[in-house]
Structure formats: C-alpha cells, structure tokens
Amino acid sequence: MLTHLDSQGRANMVDVTEKAVTEREATAEARVRMLPQTLQMIVDGEHPKGDVFAVARIAGIQAAKKTSDLIPLCHPLMLTSVKVELSAEGQDAVRIVARCKLAGQTGVEMEALTAASVAALTIYDMCKAVDKGMVIEQVRLLEKLGGKSGHYKVEA
C-alpha cells in the first residue's frame, strides 16, 4: 500500500499525529565516478575551488535539513544528527555515506538519501570544469532503524 495516496489515489501527506515518538536512523550512500586524475586532485587538495570534501560535506548536511522543501510530501523534521563522510574509493571514485538521526514520528530515509545525493551533486559541480564525464551512481538506502517497519539493511 502506498501511504502517500488517499483512497481516491490523490497525493497527500501522511498523518503521523498518532504515531509514537521513537528513535530513528537512516544511512544512505552515493558514489561519484571520475577520472583518476580528478580524484587525485581532490585527495591532494589541489582543486582551485578549495576543499571539495569539506564543501560537499556541508552541502549534504544542509540538504538533509532542507529535505521537506525539496520532496513535496516529506514532513519537516527536527534532525538531531547528520553526518556525511566522504572517502576516495579505488583510483576513480568518491564514496559518500550520509547518516541521519532523530527522535520523532517518521523516518529519516529521505533525509539521508538527499544528503548523499546533494553531496554527490556538489562534487560534480566543483569538478565539472576538469571532468565533465563524472557519473553519480549507486544512490541507495543502506540501513534504516526504528519505526513501525523495523530494521532494514541492504544485503552485501
């Protein structure tokens, strides 16, 4: 059953008024594949626009806080923690892992996915002058804890 549709198939925001406040956490990831020399420039701190990882981390955190402004039926949430980790993966990729937490009545999956996605978009934006062929891929939910649907963890 799609919870964002009413009995007549119209979009609506889910009413969470009666839901219990519980601890909730979600972790999402994204990857940005790029030329090896682009990744090396980022890792060596030689990008002319500055620290790519630092800017992408801040962008991801900001995006998590703005998710309800971007995704029409998401509730505005009082996130208690947003962490965005970026790391070089192999010779040609950046892996982004975003983790969001709160004590609330609805989950934080969309906030984690938005944080990872916007961090990836920020890397693309900062590096597009030197590598227009970058690919953002593998945006996905890794784990979700709390709430009625319980624990979800992607299979390795």
Swiss-Prot record:
One of its GO terms (molecular function) is cyclic pyranopterin monophosphate synthase activity. It is an enzyme of class 4 (lyase). Keywords: Lyase, Molybdenum cofactor biosynthesis. SUPFAM superfamilies: Molybdenum cofactor biosynthesis protein C, MoaC. InterPro entries: MoaC, MoaC_bact/euk, MoaC_sf, MoCo_biosynth_MoaA/MoaC, Mopterin_CF_biosynth-C_dom. One of its GO terms (biological process) is Mo-molybdopterin cofactor biosynthetic process. The active site is at D125. It catalyses: (8S)-3',8-cyclo-7,8-dihydroguanosine 5'-triphosphate = cyclic pyranopterin phosphate + diphosphate. This is Cyclic pyranopterin monophosphate synthase. It comes from Pseudomonas putida (strain ATCC 47054 / DSM 6125 / CFBP 8728 / NCIMB 11950 / KT2440). The gene is moaC.
